[in-house]
From Swiss-Prot:
Family: Belongs to the ferritin family.
Function: Stores iron in a soluble, non-toxic, readily available form. Important for iron homeostasis. Has ferroxidase activity. Iron is taken up in the ferrous form and deposited as ferric hydroxides after oxidation. Also plays a role in delivery of iron to cells. Mediates iron uptake in capsule cells of the developing kidney. Delivery to lysosomes is mediated by the cargo receptor NCOA4 for autophagic degradation and release of iron.
Residues found modified as Phosphoserine: S179, S183
EC number: 1.16.3.1
Organism of provenance: Trichosurus vulpecula (Brush-tailed possum)
Lineage: Eukaryota, Metazoa, Chordata, Craniata, Vertebrata
N-acetylthreonine modification, residue list: T2
Protein name: Ferritin heavy chain
Annotated positions binding Fe cation 1: E28, E63, H66
Coiled-coil stretches noted in the UniProt entry, renumbered to this chain: none
Encoding gene, per UniProt annotation: FTH1
Length: 183
């Protein structure tokens, strides 16, 4: 492995920020991996909730795009991308739509907390460009995703999930099916 040469474009980009961006890339890829696992769980013949599958596949793609955007930023700022192993999801069986939505809500809150810590680091290192990037491309979207998942969890519970299989079928058909994956 060759050592990377110093960047000629690097300016006001602290090494702690560079390292934090690499950690955030890993977290976004992990989130994408979790959502991919969820998607194909709901696509199984014995689960057969196609709109849950579509919803989580869309989320997986979004998280991968978030990682790619951070990788592009890393290169633009003169940082170096160091990829790490992506942890596998904590489970393979997501049990129910409600359980998966609760896990997704927890995941999005963890991603959001990491972004808030990255923003604080950028503030502490006096990096207005990184602050603006996080604010513009991530923070508002995270809040909206958390709200949407919270609403989904609430509605599934009100409908009687997970005790009622009919609740998840109707939610899949009428909420996720009608929304066409609105974010």
């Amino acid at each position: 492995m060759t050592t990377s040469s110093p960047s000629q474009v690097r300016q006001n980009y602290h090494q702690d920020s560079e390292a934090a961006i690499n950690r955030q890339i890993n977290l976004e890829l992990y989130a994408s991996y979790v959502y991919l696992s969820m998607s194909y769980y709901f696509d199984r013949d014995d689960v057969a909730l196609k709109n849950f599958a579509k919803y989580f596949l869309h989320q997986s793609h979004e998280e991968r795009e978030h990682a790619e955007k951070l990788m592009k930023l890393q290169n633009q700022r003169g940082g170096r991308i160091f990829l790490q192993d992506i942890k596998k999801p904590d489970r393979d069986d997501w049990e129910s739509g409600l359980n998966a939505m609760e896990c997704a809500l927890h995941l999005e809150k963890n991603v959001n907390q990491s972004l808030l810590e990255l923003h604080k680091l950028a503030t502490d290192k006096n990096d207005p460009h990184l602050c603006d990037f996080i604010e513009t491309h991530y923070l508002d979207e995270q809040v909206k995703a958390i709200k949407q998942l919270g609403d989904h969890v609430t509605n599934l519970r009100k409908m009687g999930a997970p005790d009622s299989g009919m609740a998840e079928y109707l939610f899949d058909k009428h909420t996720l099916g009608d929304s066409d994956n609105e974010s």
